[in-house]
């Protein structure tokens, strides 16, 4: 969707970093002990070794829980990560917020092997048999280095539902909230750089004490489209809310993002939790290393992890526990190749059965996204295709941490239930009854203002119009997905990609809601508030897409995932045969093994799961260490 900053800009950014301090100082920060002042002290050399805890996956949850276990004195901790530093393996692209749409398109070749696994789905019935690239972070930071950086929490009722599903009230809003706050280092908006008509509202009482490692803030740049969109949302009946961190979502707000408040670089679990943990003498990372299999003793206790570093095989032994944080696709995959999963699947691949858990890989839930687009009489990220504008934007970003490159494409997030009378007119009785099962505060649709062109989402960079116009879109995402997918294995070898079947848009309720959501996006562009800035009629898909059948057809062709895959190692009560982990994230049927990532969610809360993944990691770390 956006061009790469100029080579001079990229080199300038690197030169600034190099001149300021050696790499070790940059990563460790002030106050690091002399004994750990060399970067290599925190990175393991391949070979058989023993630790108290072995964490598989250096992603969003993995680095958070590993860092906390080391910090809280639980013992020695090793982290296994298949990738390396995204700052080195992806140029500036992963660090600059405005470049978050690189290598995330549906096309199977729109991926970058330095930071992405290159996974793709099996052909999707809900998308006319299309298989899609599904971006997943293969780097330190995992998908927190690949996501769109939105930081927002689910609703109070969604966490209450979680608590009820797993039989543990520690997941109810009031009890779970401290673990959200624990991660945060919140910085208020810089109004001087954000400009006019971009005032934010937030509740500081739910944003922690500022001692957490994870920087959350507002972008230093607000696209003009957002200020007009705010008026349009008000016209649609969506009131301004306080920052979406207090367990309430219905309404609109400028979004908070995981961005470094000083540099406007992406904040990930690597730049936050890992960099803090590098100073701990009981912490070690094995990067560029693939976990092949979890090993169990005769009592079904997880005792070690078999690894592969560029063909060299070795084992890390865990005295206390193995923590699996490989994500919604690879956590179930690794369980299955290790002998934990549906017995029939394991038998098919000749894998000795350790524990028959039929729920492993099932219950996959996800959010989809799509958008109509207009030409607008405003500066949007489309302007970055103009060389003069891009050069100035490059200077603004690298010299002042300002300008459009500091903006992660979306400014305002908004949520709603389809309002009456359109609800009765657009949705069938069956769909309305199904949606009535969700609590009153649980939204059905999310809106995201986007300063750019969306299109079919095959390849944002390649497909961005270069006709000199500025484009804006209103993306919509479904918050009540009822379609259920699954993850399975194609081989007993963890190096062979898993079989990913999100099963998007296979439930009729999802399909009806998807059509209604598209109509609401058109309502947005039809407001009187936006008339002064729209140029012509709807550009994409255009007025030829008019009937419900045509809208459904268009949605099926144009939607993509927003990369919220979850629930494939679902948490539940121990008596539930489909549950994979209990409320302490312990794998049912074996000992000394936990799953801590989005795969352990019992259900997908509305909105963006990043904050909940961090909170879950914080909570389970405290459960393990007992030192919180």
Curated annotation (Swiss-Prot):
Name of the top EC class for this enzyme: oxidoreductase
An annotated Gene Ontology molecular function: oxidoreductase activity
Signal peptide: 1-20
Disulfide cross-links: none
Practical use: Patulin was originally used as an antibiotic and specifically trialed to be used against the common cold, but it is no longer used for that purpose since it has been shown to induce immunological, neurological and gastrointestinal effects. Genotoxic effects of patulin with dose-dependent increase in DNA strand breaks in brain, liver and kidneys have been detected in mice. However, more recently, it has been proposed that patulin might also have anti-tumor properties.
Cofactors named for this entry: FAD
One Gene Ontology biological process: patulin biosynthetic process
Subcellular location: Cytoplasm, Cell cortex; Vacuole; Secreted; Secreted, Cell wall
Quaternary structure and interacting proteins, as annotated: Homodimer.
Family designation: Belongs to the GMC oxidoreductase family.
Descriptive protein name: Patulin synthase
Native organism: Aspergillus clavatus (strain ATCC 1007 / CBS 513.65 / DSM 816 / NCTC 3887 / NRRL 1 / QM 1276 / 107)
Lineage of producing organism: Eukaryota, Fungi, Dikarya, Ascomycota, Pezizomycotina
Encoding gene (name): patE
């Amino acid at each position: 969707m956006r061009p790469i900053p100029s080579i001079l800009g990229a080199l300038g950014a690197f030169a600034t970093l190099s001149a300021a301090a050696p790499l070790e100082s940059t990563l460790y920060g002030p106050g690091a002990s002399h004994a750990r002042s060399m970067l290599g002290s925190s990175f393991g050399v391949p070979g058989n070794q023993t630790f108290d805890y072995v964490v598989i996956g250096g992603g969003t949850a993995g680095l958070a829980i590993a860092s906390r276990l080391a910090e809280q004195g639980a013992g020695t901790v090793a982290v296994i990560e298949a990738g390396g530093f995204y700052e080195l393996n992806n140029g500036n692209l992963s660090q600059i917020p405005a470049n978050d749409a690189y290598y995330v398109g549906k096309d199977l070749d729109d991926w970058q092997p330095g930071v992405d696994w290159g996974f793709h789905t099996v052909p999707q019935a809900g998308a006319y048999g299309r298989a899609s690239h599904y971006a997943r972070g293969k780097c330190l930071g995992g998908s927190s280095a690949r996501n769109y950086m939105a930081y927002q929490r689910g609703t109070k009722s969604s966490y209450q539902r979680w608590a009820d599903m797993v039989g543990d009230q520690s997941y109810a809003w009031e009890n779970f909230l401290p673990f959200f706050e624990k991660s945060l280092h919140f910085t208020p908006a810089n109004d001087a750089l954000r400009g006019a008509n971009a005032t934010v509202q937030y509740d500081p009482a739910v944003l922690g004490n500022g001692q957490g490692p994870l920087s959350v803030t507002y972008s230093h740049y607000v696209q003009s489209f957002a200020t007009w969109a705010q008026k349009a949302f008000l016209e649609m009946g969506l009131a301004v809310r306080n920052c979406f961190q207090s367990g309430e979502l219905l309404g609109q707000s400028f979004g908070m993002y995981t961005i470094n408040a000083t540099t406007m670089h992406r904040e990930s679990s690597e730049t936050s939790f890992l960099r803090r943990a590098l100073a701990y003498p009981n912490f070690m990372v094995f990067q560029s290393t693939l976990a092949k299999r979890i090993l169990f003793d005769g009592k079904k206790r997880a005792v070690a992890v078999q690894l592969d570093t560029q063909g060299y095989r070795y084992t890390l032994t865990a005295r206390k526990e193995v923590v699996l944080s490989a994500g919604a696709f690879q956590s179930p995959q690794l369980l299955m190749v290790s002998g934990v999963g549906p017995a029939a699947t394991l038998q098919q691949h000749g894998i000795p059965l350790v524990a028959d858990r039929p729920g492993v890989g099932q219950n996959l839930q996800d959010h989809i996204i799509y958008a109509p687009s207009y030409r607008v009489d405003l500066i949007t990220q489309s302007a970055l295709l103009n060389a003069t504008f891009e050069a100035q934007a490059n200077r603004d970003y690298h010299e002042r941490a300002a300008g459009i490159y500091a903006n992660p494409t979306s400014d305002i997030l908004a949520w709603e239930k389809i309002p009456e009378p359109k609800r009765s007119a657009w949705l069938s009785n069956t769909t309305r009854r199904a949606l009535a099962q969700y609590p009153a505060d649980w939204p059905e649709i999310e809106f995201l203002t986007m300063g750019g062109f969306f299109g079919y989402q095959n390849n944002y960079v390649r497909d961005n119009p270069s006709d000199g116009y500025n484009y804006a879109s209103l993306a919509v995402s479904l918050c009540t997905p009822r379609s259920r997918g699954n993850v399975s294995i194609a081989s007993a070898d963890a190096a062979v990609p898993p079989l990913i079947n999100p099963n998007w848009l296979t439930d009729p309720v999802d399909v009806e809601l998807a059509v209604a959501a598209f109509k609401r996006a058109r309502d947005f562009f039809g407001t009187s508030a936006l008339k002064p800035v729209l140029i012509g009629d709807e550009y994409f898909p255009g007025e030829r897409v008019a009937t419900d059948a045509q809208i459904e057809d268009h949605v099926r062709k144009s939607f993509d995932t927003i990369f919220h895959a979850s629930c494939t190692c679902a948490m539940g009560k121990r008596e539930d045969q489909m549950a994979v982990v209990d409320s302490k994230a312990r794998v049912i049927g074996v000992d000394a093994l936990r799953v801590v990532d989005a795969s352990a969610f019992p259900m997908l809360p509305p909105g963006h799961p990043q904050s909940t993944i961090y909170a879950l990691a914080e909570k389970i770390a405290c459960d393990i260490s007992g030192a919180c």
